[in-house]
């Protein structure tokens, strides 16, 4: 619903997920609008409302994903309005022996990690139209160098900054995951 209003509550909100970014809207509250006391507004109220740009964001599947090698599936990185027009990532082919000491690509203190620290990650440029989601497809077979295998990955980007205690602080979401291409089993999706 576009309008969010609750009974006995004096605030009416617009659902921001239903509005387009960087767009002018004209909002009209009708003259016949009645409050809980039965009072009628009497004449329409017209407001101009300008939405802003989408906040920078990045999204990447995390955790463990298993895909059939018979399909050419890829790892998708979704971005929008990244302020530095780039993300950082690292990829590592996982050997079965690597999984003896860890079961995840997430970094752990005082344990063996599959991936290097994010200071060593490579930067990748992202270009896209403002306020439009850009999909970057990571070719798994190419990264694996094989039709089957497991790949560990980490991805991060600066998305926005805020001020905390008088200092600017970047929001830098991080995503970690493992993706396996296999020719064993049956692929089921639900």
Q: Where does each model-flagged region fall?
A:
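Acidic, low-complexity Ser/Thr/Gly/Pro-rich repeat segments typical of extracellular/periplasmic
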Residues: 1-181
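C-terminal segments of large proteins
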Residues: 181-190
């Amino acid at each position: 619903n576009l309008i969010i209003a609750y009974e006995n509550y004096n605030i009416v909100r617009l659902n921001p997920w239903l509005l387009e970014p960087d767009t002018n809207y004209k909002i009209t509250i009708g003259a016949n609008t009645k409050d809980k006391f039965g009072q009628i507004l009497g004449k329409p109220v017209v407001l101009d409302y300008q939405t802003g740009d989408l906040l920078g964001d990045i999204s990447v599947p995390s955790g463990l994903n298993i895909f059939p090698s018979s399909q050419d599936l890829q790892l998708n990185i979704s971005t929008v309005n990244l302020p530095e027009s780039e993300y950082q990532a690292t990829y590592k082919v996982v050997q079965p022996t690597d999984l003896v000491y860890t079961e995840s690509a997430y970094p752990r203190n005082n344990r063996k990690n599959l991936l290097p620290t994010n200071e060593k990650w490579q930067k990748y440029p992202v270009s896209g139209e403002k306020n439009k989601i850009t999909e970057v497809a990571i070719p798994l077979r190419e990264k694996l160098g094989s039709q089957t295998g497991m790949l560990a990955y980490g991805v991060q980007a600066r998305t926005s900054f805020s001020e905390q205690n008088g200092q600017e602080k970047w929001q830098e979401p991080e995503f970690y995951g493992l993706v396996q291409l296999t020719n064993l089993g049956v692929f089921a999706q639900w």
